[in-house]
Amino acid sequence: MNPELLPIIQLGNPTLRQKAAWVENIHDATIQQLIDDLIATVAKANGVGIASPQVAQSYRLFIVASRPNPRYPHAPEMEPTAMINPKIVGHSTEIVEGWEGCLSVPGIRGLVPRHQAIEVEYTDRYGNLQKQTLTDFVARIFQHEFDHLDGVLFIDRVESNLNTITEEEYQELVTKNTK
């Protein structure tokens, strides 16, 4: 079956605030189709990650798809990767702030503190357990998407309203910093 573009639900939809369900059968055709659909949806939306709850499918599953784009011109290039039933098993003490946005919270950016490095475990789409150390931008994507699985949005992590800007203001910052 061909991948389908799924509608991305927006802030206010109760699914975004729920704890997502464990994926019991990774090889289930519905889960495999959802993975393909999420990969197509995040690419079309020009995002760097998307979690299953963002398309109203409350499973512990997300895609990390880092690549340079107008919002993140310095993002590292990586293959879109399905991360199923993920866990953070360790993290650095170093916390770094970075601007985040979300396909489910359009028009707003927030300065969010995250661990600079994390040790993670997840099952890939083929049923293999993966263990990795992620750093910098990819670690930030993982932590952002992981939060979605517990009903947490990036705006919940912003420490002050002064650390919130519009997408337009953010684009001006990006443009200024890439010249």
From Swiss-Prot:
Reactions this protein catalyses: N-terminal N-formyl-L-methionyl-[peptide] + H2O = N-terminal L-methionyl-[peptide] + formate
Names of the cofactor(s): Fe(2+)
Domain of life: Bacteria
Residue positions binding Fe cation: 102, 144, 148
Cofactor mode of binding and number, as noted: Binds 1 Fe(2+) ion.
Active-site residue list: 145
InterPro entries hit by this protein: Peptide_deformylase, Peptide_deformylase_sf
Signal sequence region: none
Cited Pfam families: Pep_deformylase
Keywords: Hydrolase, Iron, Metal-binding, Protein biosynthesis
Keyword Hydrolase: yes
Function text: Removes the formyl group from the N-terminal Met of newly synthesized proteins. Requires at least a dipeptide for an efficient rate of reaction. N-terminal L-methionine is a prerequisite for activity but the enzyme has broad specificity at other positions.
Family: Belongs to the polypeptide deformylase family.
Name of the molecule in the record: Peptide deformylase 2
Species of the source: Nostoc sp. (strain PCC 7120 / SAG 25.82 / UTEX 2576)
Organism lineage: Bacteria, Bacillati, Cyanobacteriota, Cyanophyceae, Nostocales
Gene: def2
